[in-house]
């Protein structure tokens, strides 16, 4: 019987390197690949060094592939990355929302474009170094996405968009490992990326300065406007709505004699609404662009744990189906800084139920 083939998305980091090594040990025919996402200009030097697809990432991934003795490719996904990740990121900020580009990249680049490329090459699976577990439920006849064994590293929040058809062709071999075990495994294999630090920032934004990135990469005018309170009274001037996000207190550039927080961003009127901290809390939200994994669709209210951003703790909530395919999420206790444009992900224990984008 011929070996099953798997293309591993290699970022040059320790997680994807060890994922490739584990699959080799498990008897797969492994092919390494790094996504080329930067334009053909000097722009590529602007990618965050050490980021998941920078030039040094390609060098690191190639040397790991050589060490493991596997073929290695660099795949060109520049156009889809620009359209589905960078342009989406800019457009959302210009609309006064706060997007999560890593979720868009997973959805449109890794698990759509890269998977389709692999399948077109006659490869059975793609694999990544994500901390998550994929299983198959014989009773439900569905693939399930579950949290990794290590809660601090769990990455299921950014993976909720994967479909049943995609899950059939995805492997995530390090979901049962802790970060320490992954680093130890890399060391044991003699991979020099064993001690490489994790990438933290958005790969195409230097110094995490989103506002500066958008100003430099849009032809739209970033207009200053007014800070207003929740009653509409003018409090002062802001530098442009792209510089603010819900819940923000620092860096507002306005002194009001007491701490004030961004409560809402009104793109239509180019205003940033400020309020006291208690005004930043919300008991409910509406989500759209839903994807469900453990169920086919939401037909009746369901009790879940809901997570409103990557760094947030899960909170008890009930989700209700709405007629237009959206979902209403009602929390047991008010949540701080529910932010339009971010994703909300629903859990049932360690199982990902699904998720959507906050309206």
Swiss-Prot record:
It comes from Acetivibrio thermocellus (strain ATCC 27405 / DSM 1237 / JCM 9322 / NBRC 103400 / NCIMB 10682 / NRRL B-4536 / VPI 7372). InterPro entries: MnmA-like, MnmA-like_C, MnmA-like_central, MnmA-like_central_sf, Rossmann-like_a/b/a_fold. Belongs to the MnmA/TRMU family. The gene is mnmA. This is tRNA-specific 2-thiouridylase MnmA. GO terms for molecular function: ATP binding; tRNA binding; tRNA-uridine 2-sulfurtransferase activity. Coiled coil: none annotated. ATP binds at residues 9-16, 35, 129. Catalyzes the 2-thiolation of uridine at the wobble position (U34) of tRNA, leading to the formation of s(2)U34.
